[in-house]
């Protein structure tokens, strides 16, 4: 079913979740509590006629804080009071805890410590192994090599063919970032059917 014209709520109902690159403003509202920020992407605490079950919301937020080792004063803490790394752990944890069918995650470990990065990687792999589709967008090639089954590169507005992770090297990805794949924008003769 095409989702291009579907609203955010419809996409969420179908199991699509997203971790944006911009933490404050897109991933969390800076002036709202962590509990209230749950409502940006999670609807479990909503009741009939739009009522919010505040206790359920606090419990949900507390669970994310605990499971992802987020250092915060509690679910009532405002988002802007967290360090960048702790806010990242909270946003990623919020989306992972939704058990999405499809997760698009940009820069999943940006600003987090090594231990938290390992936990996030393990959770992303666990979600994938449970049958979800996980699309990771990252500038960290080592992170992509660790998480991906296959890689794509976007260069000059064009999407590369899939590259199995086992065949990926820093050098090859570097070439592809310049559009140098068979049929890529850096090889116009290949697009026309000439030798690559």
Predicted regions and their residues:
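Glycine-rich phosphate-binding loops of nucleotide-dependent enzymes
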Residues: 1-196
């Amino acid at each position: 079913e095409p989702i291009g014209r579907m609203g955010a709520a419809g996409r969420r109902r179908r199991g699509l979740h997203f971790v944006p690159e911009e933490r404050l403003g897109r991933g969390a509202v800076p002036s709202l509590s962590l509990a209230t920020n749950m409502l940006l992407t999670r609807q479990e605490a909503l009741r009939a006629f739009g009522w919010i079950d505040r206790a359920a919301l606090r419990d949900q937020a507390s669970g994310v804080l605990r499971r992802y080792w987020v250092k915060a004063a509690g679910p009532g803490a405002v988002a802007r009071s967290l360090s960048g790394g702790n806010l990242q752990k909270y946003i990623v944890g919020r989306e992972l805890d939704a058990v999405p069918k499809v997760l698009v995650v940009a820069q999943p470990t940006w600003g987090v410590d090594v231990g938290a990065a390992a936990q996030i990687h393990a959770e992303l792999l666990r979600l994938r192994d449970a049958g979800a589709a996980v699309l990771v967008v990252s500038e960290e090639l080592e992170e992509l090599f660790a998480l991906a089954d296959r890689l794509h590169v976007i260069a000059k507005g064009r999407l590369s063919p899939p590259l199995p992770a086992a065949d990926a090297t820093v050098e090859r990805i570097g070439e592809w970032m310049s559009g140098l794949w068979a049929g890529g924008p850096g090889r116009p003769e290949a697009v026309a059917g000439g030798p690559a």
